[in-house]
């Protein structure tokens, strides 16, 4: 697989223990669907997201009750917390004081300069970044009057306007998003933004739709953007359980070789040659490898026609036949296994590969520390 090159001059920005931008990997984000003031429900959902592979989570902060909940939520989660603020600068101040790792605002809708300055000074004091969220659906009136309708140039102009507000206050820990529901508009906006400034870009196709339609739309748009080396964090926005957003994001990054800590499944589309229940097997294996944090490529193939060649591209795999399967490792046949134990044997081999990877990681880490 050819390697995707990221913008090399992207400014690195810290979000909690993570660094966004620079030469770092693309980070997966999601957003809670709970009422933020409901601490129990919000924490439970965030922990489910983290278990699924979410690395940064955003919560809405529409009122004082939500802002008051931030300290308790922050205490009980393991991933960085982003707080989403609109209009009320006092909520931003309270969220920052409560332990937010990042806030998302549009400086232009916070109010007078002194209000923006208060938020910026609080963020500076705590050492947290600000995400400027540009959205095609809520561009400033003056920009819509200038361009007639939402355009990529208008979105970039909006971003630069908000960036300048922060830069004029000597604030540079900035992340920018350029979201649109229209895929072509989003692609163009991100391409132009990548050339206009060096701040990290958070990717997203907003209002993309339901689980099925939204997955296709997001993969089409964000895949095109990622293929150009653009993007430092991303969220798949779906009208679904947010855990599904994380699953789709992981698969998308794996497709481009941009996830070094995730296992990947290759499985054939099935045909009349298939003599095993390949679909059930593939689903079971996919579920099994979902939580493995190692770059293992696993193949589940249905016959001997394409099996050996395709298994050569995988670290471990099985090619099924009537009553038995061939277990492959790095393209070499390891052994024949009965159909009834085929999946369990494959899982054992997956575990061995994962343990080898973890041991290698630990050795490298120890070497760096000595």
From Swiss-Prot:
EC category name: oxidoreductase
EC number, as in UniProt: 1.17.7.3
Keyword Signal: no
Molecular function (Gene Ontology), one example: iron ion binding
Co-factor note (free text): Binds 1 [4Fe-4S] cluster.
Pfam families membership: GcpE (PF04551)
Record-listed [4Fe-4S] cluster binding positions: 268, 271, 303, 310
Pathways involved: Isoprenoid biosynthesis; isopentenyl diphosphate biosynthesis via DXP pathway; isopentenyl diphosphate from 1-deoxy-D-xylulose 5-phosphate: step 5/6
Cofactor: [4Fe-4S] cluster
Catalytic activity, reaction form: (2E)-4-hydroxy-3-methylbut-2-enyl diphosphate + oxidized [flavodoxin] + H2O + 2 H(+) = 2-C-methyl-D-erythritol 2,4-cyclic diphosphate + reduced [flavodoxin]
Keywords: 4Fe-4S, Iron, Iron-sulfur, Isoprene biosynthesis, Metal-binding, Oxidoreductase
Annotated GO biological process: isopentenyl diphosphate biosynthetic process, methylerythritol 4-phosphate pathway; terpenoid biosynthetic process
PANTHER family: 4-HYDROXY-3-METHYLBUT-2-EN-1-YL DIPHOSPHATE SYNTHASE (PTHR30454), 4-HYDROXY-3-METHYLBUT-2-EN-1-YL DIPHOSPHATE SYNTHASE (FERREDOXIN), CHLOROPLASTIC (PTHR30454:SF0)
Function noted in UniProt: Converts 2C-methyl-D-erythritol 2,4-cyclodiphosphate (ME-2,4cPP) into 1-hydroxy-2-methyl-2-(E)-butenyl 4-diphosphate.
NCBIfam families: ispG_gcpE, PRK00366.1
Family statement drawn from the similarity comment of this UniProt entry: Belongs to the IspG family.
Protein name per UniProt: 4-hydroxy-3-methylbut-2-en-1-yl diphosphate synthase (flavodoxin)
Taxon lineage: Bacteria, Bacillati, Bacillota, Bacilli, Bacillales
């Amino acid at each position: 697989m050819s390697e995707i090159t990221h913008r090399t001059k992207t400014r690195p920005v810290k979000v909690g223990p993570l660094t966004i931008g620079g030469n770092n990997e693309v980070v997966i984000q999601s957003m809670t669907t709970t009422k933020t003031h409901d601490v129990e429900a919000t924490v439970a959902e965030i922990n489910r997201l983290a278990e699924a592979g979410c690395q940064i989570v955003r919560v809405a902060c529409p009122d004082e009750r939500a802002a008051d909940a931030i300290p308790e939520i922050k205490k009980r989660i393991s991933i960085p917390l982003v707080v989403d603020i609109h209009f009320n600068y006092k909520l931003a101040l309270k969220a920052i004081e409560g332990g937010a790792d990042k806030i998302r605002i549009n400086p232009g809708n916070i109010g007078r300069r002194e209000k923006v300055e208060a938020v910026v000074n609080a963020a500076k004091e705590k050492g947290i970044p600000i995400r400027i969220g540009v959205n095609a659906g809520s561009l400033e009136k003056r920009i819509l009057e200038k361009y007639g309708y939402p355009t990529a140039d208008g979105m970039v102009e909006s971003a630069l306007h908000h960036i300048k507000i922060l830069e004029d206050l000597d604030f540079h820990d900035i992340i920018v998003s350029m979201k649109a529901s229209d895929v072509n508009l989003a692609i163009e906006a991100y391409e132009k933004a990548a050339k206009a400034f060096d701040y990290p870009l958070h990717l997203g196709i907003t209002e993309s739709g339901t689980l099925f339609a939204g997955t296709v739309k997001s993969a089409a748009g964000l895949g095109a953007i990622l293929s150009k080396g653009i993007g430092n964090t991303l969220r798949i926005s779906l009208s679904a359980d947010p855990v599904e957003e994380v699953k789709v994001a992981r698969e998308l990054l794996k497709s481009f070789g941009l996830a070094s800590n995730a296992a990947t499944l290759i499985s054939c589309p099935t045909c009349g040659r298939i003599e095993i229940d390949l679909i059930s097997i593939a689903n079971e294996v996919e579920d099994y490898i979902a939580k493995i944090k190692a770059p293992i490529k696993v193949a589940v193939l249905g016959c001997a026609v394409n099996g050996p060649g395709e298994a050569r591209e995988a670290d471990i795999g099985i090619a099924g036949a009537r009553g038995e399967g061939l277990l492959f490792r790095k393209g070499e046949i390891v052994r024949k296994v009965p159909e009834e134990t085929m999946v369990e044997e494959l899982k054992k081999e997956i575990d061995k590969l994962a343990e080898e990877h973890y041991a290698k990681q630990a050795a490298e880490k120890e070497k760096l520390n000595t």
